[in-house]
């Protein structure tokens, strides 16, 4: 029974409200952005979930909750910016014995690393480790690995790149003479080109583990 769930780096709650359909108990979404949290709570109210799902502004690196009070910590697409090994070790104290973490993190799927890709992700603020390395970090932190699997490429192409392309069109119309916007978009397209060429070697990986 999942009595208490944290969704860290929840954004506006896209995945949180999917979780709420499948998991009983309370879910607290935490995000640094107050604007995201406002949207999150408005969505919860619209769905009639405000008594069970609530968003709070805060940092996944500084949780203001009791130790061993959480059944599941969920984090999609946010852990890599602050450090996989660092965060899973920190979060463990807040999980009940036998509690779970479920996180996604961009990872190498092979030991055959590409320097150009590594450099891009380091510049972006989050270097890539191999999936095997991250599983090892979970075990070192005191978890049992339950499942590890790569998300399909469509999660990048259809759910990330395509919506971003649409947003880029709006930016260009709003700021037609902005060098900063053009540089930003060029960086986006470079990221896409790397994934198109090397996407068989790296991708987002889902890690599910249980606290010992």
What is the predicted function of each stretch?
Residues 106-125:
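Short, glycine-/aromatic-enriched active-site segment of Class I SAM-dependent methyltransferases
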Residues 72-85:
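A short SAM/SAH-binding and catalytic strip from SAM-dependent methyltransferases
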Residues 64-72:
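A short acidic, Gly/Pro-enriched loop at the edge of an enzyme's catalytic core
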Residues 149-212:
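Conserved Class I S-adenosyl-L-methionine
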Residues 2-11:
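Conserved class I S-adenosyl-L-methionine
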